[in-house]
A protein has these predicted regions:
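Hydrophobic or amphipathic, alpha-helical segments that drive membrane association/targeting
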Residues: 1-138, 145, 338-340, 344, ...
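Secretory-pathway/luminal and periplasmic proteins that interact with or process carbohydrate-rich
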Residues: 132-133, 194-201, 261-267
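Cytosolic-facing loops and C-terminal tails of multi-pass membrane proteins
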Residues: 1-20, 207-230, 239, 243, ...
Length: 414
């Protein structure tokens, strides 16, 4: 399916959802059931074929074609079982226990009780500027779910406690009530199909070819048909967040995350990597990140970053709506918030152990980036040496060398 057809199907699902929400959900459930029916049908066909062939061979009837049938039935059975029992990797990061961060787990429990949501089974702390709840299928396509919450250390550094709790309420909002359970079931189903589609990409043989043909037809249509449901779920999660913490707090969290995550990507990381010019060994970023994220971003940068964020339209590449649409749905002002105060930092939810986790992620970052840092240090050394050479001969430089010198200085100052 090409992109134009996919977008067309997404728009049809959005219109269907707007015209008749219950009817749309029934159609989504029916299309999901079609995938289940295909898996069960393949499982029964392969099992029946295996039983028939083995029974025939046990009664002395042997034909060369039986070998091919055994291989085909075995391949189909294996593919069906893979579809029923997809295995997912655990989230990256460090698993937190209630004893590590009592205040965090108490806050999660309060949110759970207020929205009457299911329990979070495992909580992970990672290095992303994000928070997310993922529900991995416990039994593949056929039910069960393990709820994982991933919390980014930079996010804890950037927000005060109320705004961070608004983010947690948004994430927990994905699991609330009957609609949440239906959306979570569709989400788990989508994950299972996506993994099966990925795992079978390079398989060969007639059984794999038939399975791939079905997936090429079914999976993009399933993704398009469920897109409106996933988009609705984001707005509903925002609504839950606004209801629990207040619309102003939820909106301020969205805006502050948009601006500060942009600042980290465009300003902090380039500046941090420039330290490789003077430092041969990698330097952990999170101690300095903590101090800088506790400050207000530069005014000009913040205003321009917000303008850019508000210009981004909601498209089919991401089920998350754009910032403008999310703020409008919350009926909130599209302006810069008062920045989070470091005296009420969400990092305090980790308790006295926050310094330990910062040191842990600094050490891990240095380990993961040691080779790249070494190469960057050597590269900046060559740039600096060449810049010094051209600076010494500046009066004799050609126009091309002057342009080269300007480019080298820009790289050193980046």
């Amino acid at each position: 399916m090409d992109r134009a057809d996919f977008i067309h199907l997404v728009r049809l699902s959005e219109h269907a959802s707007a015209d008749d929400s219950k009817g749309y959900r029934r159609s989504v459930a029916a299309f999901a059931a079609l995938g289940y029916a295909w898996v069960v049908g393949c499982l029964l066909l392969s099992a029946g074929l295996l039983v028939w062939v083995v029974n025939a061979m046990l009664h002395g009837r042997f034909k060369a074609v039986f070998i091919g049938l055994l291989v085909a039935a075995g391949g189909l059975l294996w593919t069906s079982l893979k579809a029923l029992w997809c295995r997912f990797d655990e989230p990256e990061g460090v698993e937190l226990q209630a004893g590590d961060a009592p205040a965090l787990f108490e806050s999660l429990e309060r949110i759970r009780k207020k929205i009457k949501g299911p329990p979070i089974h495992r909580v992970f702390l990672d290095a992303d500027f994000n928070a997310s709840i993922r529900q991995h299928p416990r039994y593949g396509l056929f039910g069960g779910g393990v709820n994982y919450l991933s919390i980014g250390l930079p996010l804890l550094m950037a927000l005060d406690r109320p705004r961070f709790l608004a983010v947690l309420a948004h994430e927990y909002g994905h699991l609330r009530g009957d609609h949440g359970r239906f959306a979570a079931w569709i989400y788990r189903t989508r994950l299972s199909w996506a993994m099966l589609n990925h795992d079978l990409r390079h398989d060969e043989g007639p059984v794999a070819a038939a399975t791939q043909a079905f997936l090429r037809w079914y999976f993009p249509r399933f993704s398009a048909k469920t897109f409106a449901l996933a988009r609705q779920d984001e707005y509903e999660a925002d609504r839950i967040s606004g209801k629990l913490l207040g619309k102003d707090v939820a909106a301020a969290a969205l805006t502050e995350i948009a601006v500060k995550s942009d600042w980290v990507a465009r300003e902090f990381w380039p500046d941090h990597w420039s330290a490789a010019s003077a430092q041969a060994l990698p330097v952990g970023p999170y101690v300095s990140m903590r101090a800088l994220l506790g400050l207000a971003p530069p005014g000009d940068f913040a205003r321009e970053s917000l303008r850019q964020a508000l210009r981004r339209i909601s498209d089919v590449d991401d089920t998350h709506p754009g910032l403008r649409d999310r703020l409008e749905a919350l009926e909130a002002a599209k302006c810069l918030p008062a920045w989070s105060s470091s005296s009420r930092s969400a990092l305090d939810l980790l308790g006295p152990g926050s310094a330990k986790w910062i040191a842990h992620f600094d050490k891990q970052w240095c380990k993961d980036n040691a080779s790249d840092w070494k190469q960057h240090h050597a590269y900046l050394g060559r740039v600096r040496a060449r810049a010094a050479e051209l600076t010494a001969s500046e009066r004799r430089n050609s126009a091309e060398e002057m342009v080269e010198l300007g480019n080298l200085k820009r790289r050193l100052n980046a």
